């Protein structure tokens, strides 16, 4: 039986319904949950006084004070193993591949989770939204039972990541796509500015646990196209764990490069591409006690899957028709599938959305594989793309991505450099400020709308994976029309004008007339 901390205060929410046990059998005596009470104005005030943390007690001490136990568990198993496979590993083992050399997956004890019905889990997750109780203020750790159920809350390394904005892209959807129900899940609104935080909080928390268990881990390393290294270095710095980063020289933005440097990572700028860096970090972690943080390590996907759960939660547990995800190393498309599928299997929803994986045409091995009918996957040499984080020609999670897309009748699309930059500029013109990777996803949406695959009324979610502020140079180049062989149709360069009233008025009148003609 594993110990875990369930904070009493996180289960109390005004008007929250009672949580009922679904199973008719006797509950396991090792499971102890606090049942939410329906709060009134009076008992809510009493509750706030009762659960206020004493002045001399820190947030982790409060978590320990309200500690209880459960019998949920998880383990590593070979990815997509058959029912007769008996191979498995504890999450406390340092292992990245199965005996046959294949990928691993984190398998949860679904029988234990199914002892509680969908209404229970919906109410539990909803009751934690907006709380500061440790660690449930995090959008990842608010689903702790589904992520790393056996880790002690004292070992968790979190910046309360997740809980990212899901907003209605009304003007963009109506003006450019004729859509009325288009949404953007902005995972870039996070601690280090990308969705990688969701996975890194899980991985670094487990490393923190392993180091306390005196496992041979002297640091954590990754190959990166920018965002992974930013997340790794930040979370390792928070826990006082050394981080080692392999970056392809001159292939990431300065904003991405400065993040691991600022957070104290040991950064190696290597004269190769991401695939070359990935090969080197694999070889290094096989020889040195450095924990591998790339998505070959399936722990990260446990955190990333919570974005899918969060989308359902933000829609009041209604399922959208489509979710479009940019894809490079391809772990995220599988993570989204896994999150949606867990919600279906545990009764929170009755179906899952169709997934679309969007790739840059300059790095499109999954797209080519999809167009061939999933026959004979071949890596490609990734060419330079403005969507630098997905400039990957030999994705680690290809098998995971294919499985996910086949299970949900998914689609793969691609975007040329001009298409993705135009889409980014169009989105920005309606009040967004997106990254080029989101431009790839929006291009996929344009194509699927134009072909009639996605209907104008289909509820569709585009996953924005990073913050646009990481990619300002690409936006400057576009609006300055300085990109070779690109028309930059939606560029909006500044207008140079003399410093006198008449010149300014002439320019303004011309601008206002042009705007009026568009009405």
Swiss-Prot record:
Pathway it belongs to?
A: Amino-acid biosynthesis; L-threonine biosynthesis; L-threonine from L-aspartate: step 5/5
The stretch annotated as transit peptide is 1-40
> Which family is this sequence assigned to?
Belongs to the threonine synthase family.
PROSITE patterns (UniProt xref): DEHYDRATASE_SER_THR (PS00165)
Signal peptide location: none
> Cellular location of this protein?
Plastid, Chloroplast
Protein's recorded name:
Threonine synthase, chloroplastic
Ligand binding (pyridoxal 5'-phosphate): 328-332, 465
GO CC, sorted alphabetically, is: chloroplast; cytoplasm
Any one biological process term the GO annotation gives: threonine biosynthetic process
Documented activity regulation: Allosterically activated by S-adenosyl-methionine (SAM).
Q: What does this protein do?
A: Catalyzes the gamma-elimination of phosphate from L-phosphohomoserine and the beta-addition of water to produce L-threonine.
The cofactor required is: pyridoxal 5'-phosphate
Pfam families given in the database record: PALP
Q: Which NCBIfam families match?
A: thrC (TIGR00260)
Record PTM N6-(pyridoxal phosphate)lysine, positions in chain: 196
Q: How does it assemble?
A: Homodimer.
- What's one GO MF term for it? threonine synthase activity
EC number assigned by the record? 4.2.3.1
Catalyzes what? O-phospho-L-homoserine + H2O = L-threonine + phosphate
Q: Does the keyword Lyase apply?
A: yes
Q: Which UniProt keywords apply?
A: Allosteric enzyme, Amino-acid biosynthesis, Chloroplast, Lyase, Plastid, Pyridoxal phosphate, S-adenosyl-L-methionine, Threonine biosynthesis, Transit peptide
Q: Which InterPro entries match?
A: Cys_Synth/Cystath_Beta-Synth (IPR050214), Ser/Thr_deHydtase_PyrdxlP-BS (IPR000634), Thr_synthase-like (IPR004450), TrpB-like_PALP (IPR001926), TrpB-like_PALP_sf (IPR036052)
